[in-house]
Amino acid sequence: MICKDVGVIGYAEALRIQEQLVAKVQQGGEEALLLLEHLPVYTIGAGGSRDNVLDPELEPVRVNRGGDVTYHGPGQLVCYPILDLSRRGRDLHRYLRFLERFLVELCAGLGVACHTVPGRTGVWTGNGKLASIGVGVRRWVSMHGFALNVSPDTAPFSRINPCGMPDCRITSLSLELGEELFVDDLKETVAIRFQPFLHLHLPR
């Protein structure tokens, strides 16, 4: 698996890189893991509702992933796995549960206890949502992925119903631990842990 850290990047550029990697995997190339932070952007999934955009001046980017409207910005660790799911069971539900499990165990290793909520994709603590997940597939190659709140400004989330949930509070690793963390501090940990976790829980 290729691991690429592309730093802080605009959404359109990140999408372009994903599409290039997806095409390579479709042609039998190596799977990839993109690690990044986005410049501030609101996105909305293919089935998302405009009703969840509370600020009428907002124009979220419509993208080919599941889920509703969300915010991405500095302080979020965004991870886009580009995986050949045709060789991993062709089960999108199982893949979503795999990502949740990875996040729960990753955060536990950092000292933050979190959990999933039945019927709601993502990861929570008792204080709010810690990570959001939205994926898409093209000919059974995955794109998009998860966004883990490390130390983002949470104010932009007030302009939307995050993930389509009016009651959704937002938390972060920094808020949970009471100390400031940085995305760059976690990239290596995610890169090291993701591949063996993938082979264990979602083998080819």
From Swiss-Prot:
The record marks 129 as: Lowers pKa of active site Cys. Substrate binds at residues 65-72, 132-134, 145-147. The active site is at 163 (acyl-thioester intermediate). Keywords: Acyltransferase, Cytoplasm, Transferase. Residues 27-202 form the BPL/LPL catalytic domain. SUPFAM superfamilies: Class II aaRS and biotin synthetases. Coiled coil: none annotated. It comes from the Bacteria. It is found in: Cytoplasm. Pathway: Protein modification; protein lipoylation via endogenous pathway; protein N(6)-(lipoyl)lysine from octanoyl-[acyl-carrier-protein]: step 1/2. Pfam families: LplA-B_cat. InterPro entries: aa-tRNA-synth_II/BPL/LPL, BPL_LPL_catalytic, Octanoyltransferase, Octanoyltransferase_CS. Its main location: cytoplasm. Its EC number is 2.3.1.181. One of its GO terms (cellular component) is cytoplasm. It is an enzyme of class 2 (transferase). One of its GO terms (biological process) is protein modification process. GO terms for molecular function: lipoyl(octanoyl) transferase activity. It catalyses: octanoyl-[ACP] + L-lysyl-[protein] = N(6)-octanoyl-L-lysyl-[protein] + holo-[ACP] + H(+). NCBIfam families: lipB (TIGR00214), PRK14345.1 (NF010925). Belongs to the LipB family. Catalyzes the transfer of endogenously produced octanoic acid from octanoyl-acyl-carrier-protein onto the lipoyl domains of lipoate-dependent enzymes. Lipoyl-ACP can also act as a substrate although octanoyl-ACP is likely to be the physiological substrate. In the reaction, the free carboxyl group of octanoic acid is attached via an amide linkage to the epsilon-amino group of a specific lysine residue of lipoyl domains of lipoate-dependent enzymes. This is Octanoyltransferase. It comes from Geobacter sp. (strain M21). The lineage of its organism: Bacteria, Pseudomonadati, Thermodesulfobacteriota, Desulfuromonadia, Geobacterales.
